[in-house]
């Protein structure tokens, strides 16, 4: 009938036996749902990063590591990664530009201040390889922070081409 029972038996020195049966059907169903959610997050064509309230990485999907590998950024998205270390690695690469008049450390400070103050935000990020990313940042009720990054370079290039054609008319 789909019920999952956990059986636990303990034999005592006098030879008696204690048997405890626990219905863990709900736990098994939740486990299946969590695995399905994890699979969905791993297979969406966007980068998903989930950080705790102290800016330590809870999880990131494989797409995040793929992007860093493709760009030669020496930072792997592993549980516990500190946000500041990720930003420092990105800003040390040729793909992420430190704003004029700033240093890596002042840019890290600015980004940390942004993260502390933002509740929900949508923004575009332009990288030095001419790619454009649409970023959604959301502070959750428990203080954790969710960021979703979508590569919109093709869309932006088509918009430029349409504008160029429209201007030519």
What residues fall within each predicted segment?
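Intrinsically disordered, low-complexity linker/propeptide segments enriched in Ser/Thr/Gly/Pro
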Residues: 1-8, 19, 135, 164-169
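PAS-family sensory domains
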Residues: 1, 11-25, 46-116, 139-152
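PAS-associated C-terminal cap
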Residues: 22-33, 150-164
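Per-ARNT-Sim (PAS) sensory domains and their PAS-associated C-terminal
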Residues: 1-5, 109-133
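PAS/LOV and related PAS-like sensory modules
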Residues: 32-62, 66, 161-169
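Short, ordered coil/turn segments that flank beta-strands lining enzyme active or ligand-binding pockets
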Residues: 13, 53, 62, 128, ...
């Amino acid at each position: 009938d789909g019920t999952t029972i956990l059986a636990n038996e303990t034999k005592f020195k006098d030879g008696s036996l204690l048997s405890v049966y626990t219905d863990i059907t709900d736990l098994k169903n939740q486990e299946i749902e969590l695995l399905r959610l994890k699979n969905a997050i791993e297979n969406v064509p966007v980068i998903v990063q989930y950080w705790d309230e102290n800016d330590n990485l809870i999880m990131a999907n494989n797409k995040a590591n793929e992007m860093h590998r493709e760009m030669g950024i020496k930072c792997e998205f592993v549980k516990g990664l500190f946000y500041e270390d990720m930003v420092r690695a990105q800003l040390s690469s040729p793909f992420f530009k430190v704003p004029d008049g700033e240093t890596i450390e002042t840019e890290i400070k600015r980004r940390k201040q942004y993260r502390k103050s933002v509740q929900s935000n949508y923004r575009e990020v332009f990288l030095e390889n001419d790619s454009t990313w649409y970023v959604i940042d959301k502070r959750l009720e428990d203080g954790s922070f969710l960021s979703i990054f979508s590569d919109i370079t093709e869309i932006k290039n088509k918009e430029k081409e349409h504008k160029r054609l429209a201007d030519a008319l």
